Amino acid sequence: MDQSSSPSQPESQAQPNLCIPCSLGTCLIHFHEFSSSSFMDPVSLFCSSPYPNLPPHSRSSSLESKKPSVASQDVKSDGTLPIGTNNNPLIPSHSQESSHWTIRHESMPSALAGSSAQSMQQFPSITQNEENFRFKKSFTQPQPIVKETTFPKSEPGQEHAKLSDLSYEEFLKKYSSTKVERVSEAAPPPSSLNSSTVLDENDSLISQGSSVDDQTDFLGFDDSLSYAYILNPTSDSDVDLIRQYFIPKEGTYTFSNMHIRYVSANPKTPVMYMVDPAYEPHKQIARYEKLQQIFQVVEATVSPEVGERLIGLYFRYIHRVYPVIHGERFLLAFKKAKHKLSPILLTAMYASSIIYWDADKELRNYPRLDAKKLWDLTEDFLDLSFSLSRLSTLQAAIIFLTGRPWINVAGNWSILTRAIALAQILGFHLDCSEWQIPKEEKILRNRVWWALFVNEKWLSMYIGINASIRQDDYLVPPLTDNQLLAGEQRIADSFNVFVKMAELSILLQNVLQHLFNARAVMTMSKNRRTVAQKISKYLISLEEFSCSCNLRENQPGSLSLFLQIDALELLLRKTALKLKLTDAVYQQEMLNVVQRCVSHFLAINESHFTDFFWPYSQFYFCILSSAIIKMYLDFEFNENFNATTFGLLSSFTKHCVWLKFRNFDLVFMAYKRLNALLIELSSGRPLIGKLLQETFEHRKRNLDETLT
């Protein structure tokens, strides 16, 4: 580990104990070891004496790794777990009998709650026996699940290529192009599924001699049932009292099974985290059992070979523009210790990659997985996981929100609001630049927050719900294009798209907050001059932002970014036209904007199908289709504009149908809505009727059939 990035040791620390919060992903005593060596879940908040009721001499000196399963009936009637027994997931057993200390289902992800050897070297008072202790979870054997799909196997004498062909840098270089290959006719199943998606064992990006335990976090069904959260000035725990009388600067304090860690470098604005024990552990145990069952379904659905290809697609098309995980750490774990990855995160990555299935020549010959089923499983995972503080839960939620296709808008909003609440509980809305945590963790925390911010603003705009993040609710500094992690130099251009999307979302926040909050909408017609001034100011800012986007035409994610710029300008122009602000000027400007938007829409072709698109584009296409139809109806009897507006409508409709029949999912909603509206407008309008006949393959007015 890079010692230069490691924070200093706390001056005072509790008696050395094995670290349950490390398993939780909320360790702040070992945060220098935990966060810099594991970025699957670097919440890195807290760790102190996890066994306050256990004498130091009674800790086992010979147990080496495995822990018995815990059943719900082991919980006492008062909701606590027995201390000093092998059934308490928070207390290590003292028994030397190890006959029942076995992992009953080796394929299930397990979690280690002990610290790595590297961290123990930094705490010399901990004995070597304690250093060797590993605290693993065991689950009862689940019922076997029959796989729903059968995948081709390798021929005898041939082996699957493992995920060790390329380094992270080489992988990004190899897949720097996003050019799509057209789907060919069905070919016979391949004899082997070649893969080149993860790090080489001698990758220079990984510190020499590092083990998997040094480089990965132990996620998933970990043993800790504690809750981590940040203390605020209005919290029931008095921050000033704790800081002044119970805990030194950058120190720790433990009382009544609760652990506090002080991380603020500025005593005037203290920042502390607390970890409370679970008050209803029997419910958490039941939750873990349900999570286990869900992941068994995932493993039965996604074979290891197909899973490798899907992860390759994720890093090839999504991670480049949307880097919300630590790619290097994840790929290393995927290669060496896949069972230690977060099941919820892995499932979300699988589901989000299916949209690019046809871009992989090998996957074309395999039965296509049901994306909806994997998204449903991800949603089930999230529903069960939001009650525990995990960064992997946040990352999975963020990936879920950008997944395609969207099916349940209300469900997505529910996931989004819970993810925002969890991020605020864990302090992701605060400026961590002065915190005593590694630089890489600071970068990742900022990325996660801005990814949530982007999703919240655009979803709020498109579905018309008031934003839940206000301008005064966060202190996170803006993203910059130089905030790259190890091995990400080759995706710097694509990362700039993410930076620009966050910047555009800040502008959108101002528009929504000042023009479209509930009170402003109700009084808009009474304050037309003020509204006109605000719209003019925002249009100037949007033009300046657009000019600052020095992006290549074929840069991954750039087309989707420009579509969102068009969407925001269209919103502002529509609002001005609705208020009849100098009609002639705004009508002409509105027509110019629609022409430019249609021009960008017509530029979408098959080479863009594997580009990264924000899923909100589907709402924008619907808004654009409605704007074109309204403009045509407004100018239906205007000789100067009638031909122009009908030409726009005809071009948009034909291209929308063309994209739909090539399975470009982002136009499905616009296709259905456009078809329904044109059917309703075709009566008495020969031009519309002819357009409908030429572009759509049916002429029935039965709306139910047109929407199938």
Swiss-Prot record:
The keyword Membrane does not apply. Residues 24-53 bind DNA. Pfam families: Fungal_trans (PF04082). Residues 58-72 have a biased composition (Low complexity). Keywords: DNA-binding, Metal-binding, Nucleus, Transcription, Transcription regulation, Vacuole, Zinc. Its main location: other. One of its GO terms (biological process) is DNA-templated transcription. Residues 56-101, 180-200 are annotated as: Disordered. One of its GO terms (molecular function) is DNA-binding transcription factor activity. One of its GO terms (cellular component) is vacuole. Residues 83-101 have a biased composition (Polar residues). InterPro entries: Carb_Metab_Trans_Reg, Transcription_factor_dom_fun. It is found in: Vacuole; Nucleus. This is Uncharacterized transcriptional regulatory protein C105.03c. It comes from Schizosaccharomyces pombe (strain 972 / ATCC 24843) (Fission yeast). The lineage of its organism: Eukaryota, Fungi, Dikarya, Ascomycota, Taphrinomycotina.
